[in-house]
Amino acid sequence: KKNIEAYQEKLLQLDQRLTELSAKAPQKLFVTTHAAFGHLAEDYGLQQVAIMGISPDAEPTPADLKNLISTIKDNQVKYVFFETLVSPRIAQTVAEASGAETLVLDPLEGLSEAGRNNGDDYLKIMTRNIDNLELALGVK
């Protein structure tokens, strides 16, 4: 029971950080490789724009890329997120074309071998995700 309560407290701390992030962030829009973060965005009043829709394997059209690059520039988005288990190639291309940089936002779909070797778990990965969101949305 103590372990459950301790873990619940850590989850509440993550939720509190995300709530504070949403309240403090001057930028609410973030760009991701694919639309894996809709629930997070909706729950915390943020706006996700995905390069490739739902599937991480889909290829955007040239028109999609042009519109996305315009959105990034118009909204002064400083970072384009990519995922740990997906090639960062398209995110890097979009970032370069728009003057942004890339960061990792992990959808927690699986652990890489490096992640397993580092002892990563849900709490550690979400903490890194929040750190990166704070940076991307102008809180840090």
Regions found by a protein language model. Give the residues of each.
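Extracytoplasmic metal-acquisition and chelation regions
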Residues: 1-140
